[in-house]
């Protein structure tokens, strides 16, 4: 009985403590590189109240790699 009470208490504590955590979500759209970094940050803040960065991505495809810029917007759900 004592062990099951301790286990129940731990489960309840875990559920309560994990329910208050903010989850991180993301959104993304194309941007034109570092010159649009400020626009990426402004749009991310306006749409989601988050932090946006314009990042270069490369897909190593044959015969030539594909590169593109994406605005990665990270925000609390």
UniProtKB/Swiss-Prot annotation:
Gene for this chain: LCR39
Protein's cellular compartments: Secreted
S-S bridge residues: 25-77, 31-54, 40-71, 44-73
Signal peptide bounds: 1-22
UniProt keyword list: Antimicrobial, Disulfide bond, Fungicide, Plant defense, Secreted, Signal
Family: Belongs to the DEFL family.
GO biological process: defense response to fungus; killing of cells of another organism
Protein name: Putative defensin-like protein 185
Gene Ontology CC, one term: extracellular region
Organism (species): Arabidopsis thaliana
